């Protein structure tokens, strides 16, 4: 793989998580901060956990902020971290409005959770068909210890994203804290789903908690990650999902420089 083949984006989430509400930017302002540095964006449509769905005026402001952005994805809202076909349908429509190519879903968004999951696979297929018609791909993200959920979805829906409109996002930080993928969980997650891999989430931790640290502040072996991505020839979007109480933009810039130094 040649250098600079990751399409780097950054998440708006870091501007709001664990920060005092009086310091929050608007969502369009957060998008503007990221795009001014040349990043694509992953849009979260909520700032606090309980923030209401977007009004028409705010949607239009987000549309304008996203105009001309290299890569746009949307992360599902917390209230849709359970199976809610109507709510997810609204998120698909929002993706289409702002030009987002992907809607990122946790397994529980598709009913893939609990001790005896019974997902509505026909409903998921209908949602995927709706998304395809809007130019949006559904992308299933691993959370902690969810290899079983990704496998089940691919077994039931199909493992060819071109046919199913369901791809996989490997969240490197989530893989690192997982106990279901052996001693090299990041490498094993990436290699297992390389045929469905259409998206990455990048952040660091120490292998025990989902801290979303800047790259290099935890214990993830980023050189090994780079080698694995080159080996599987991944050439797609990678979203920096970072939190920092200080200068968040500096963390994004440092992460980009570090990844480029690794040939990504």
Regions picked out by a protein language model, each given a short descriptive name:
Residues 11-18, 44-48, 75-79, 108-110, ...:
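Active-site beta-loop-alpha junctions enriched in small/polar residues
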Residues 20-27, 52-63, 83-92, 114-125, ...:
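Distinct, well-ordered alpha-helical segments
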Residues 98-115:
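Active-site groove signature of glycoside hydrolases
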Residues 1-96, 101, 264:
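N-terminal pre-domain/capping segments
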Residues 69-70, 95, 155-159, 223-228, ...:
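Short, electropositive alpha-helical surface patch
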Residues 59-75, 124-134, 222-225:
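Alpha-helix-loop-beta-strand connector modules within alpha/beta enzyme cores
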Residues 41, 71, 128-219:
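Acidic/histidine-rich catalytic cores of soluble enzymes
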Residues 6-13, 39-43, 70-76, 103-105, ...:
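Hydrophobic faces of well-ordered beta-strands that scaffold small-molecule active sites
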């Amino acid at each position: 793989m040649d250098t600079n083949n990751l399409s780097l984006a950054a998440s708006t989430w870091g501007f709001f998580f664990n920060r005092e509400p009086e310091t929050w930017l608007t969502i369009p302002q957060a998008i503007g901060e990221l795009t001014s540095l040349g990043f694509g964006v992953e849009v979260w449509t909520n700032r606090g956990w309980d923030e209401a769905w977007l009004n028409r005026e705010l949607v239009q402001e987000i549309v304008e902020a996203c105009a001309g952005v290299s890569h746009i994805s949307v992360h599902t809202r917390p209230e849709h971290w359970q199976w809610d076909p109507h709510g997810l349908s609204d998120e698909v429509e929002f993706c289409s409005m702002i030009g987002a190519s992907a809607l990122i879903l946790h397994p529980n968004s598709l009913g893939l959770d609990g001790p005896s999951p019974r997902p509505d696979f026909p409903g998921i297929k209908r949602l995927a068909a709706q998304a395809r018609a809007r130019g949006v791909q559904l992308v299933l993200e691993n959370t902690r210890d969810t290899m079983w959920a990704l496998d089940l979805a691919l077994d039931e829906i199909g493992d060819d994203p071109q046919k199913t409109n369901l791809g996989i996002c490997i969240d490197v930080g989530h893989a690192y804290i997982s106990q279901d993928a052996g001693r090299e969980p990041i490498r094993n997650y990436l290699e297992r789903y390389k045929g469905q891999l259409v998206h990455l989430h990048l952040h660091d931790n120490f292998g025990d908690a989902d801290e979303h640290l800047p790259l290099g502040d935890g214990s993830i072996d980023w050189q090994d990650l780079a080698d694995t991505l080159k080996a599987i020839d991944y050439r797609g979007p990678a979203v920096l999902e970072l939190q920092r109480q200080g200068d968040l933009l500096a963390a994004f810039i440092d992460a980009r420089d570090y990844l480029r130094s690794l040939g990504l």
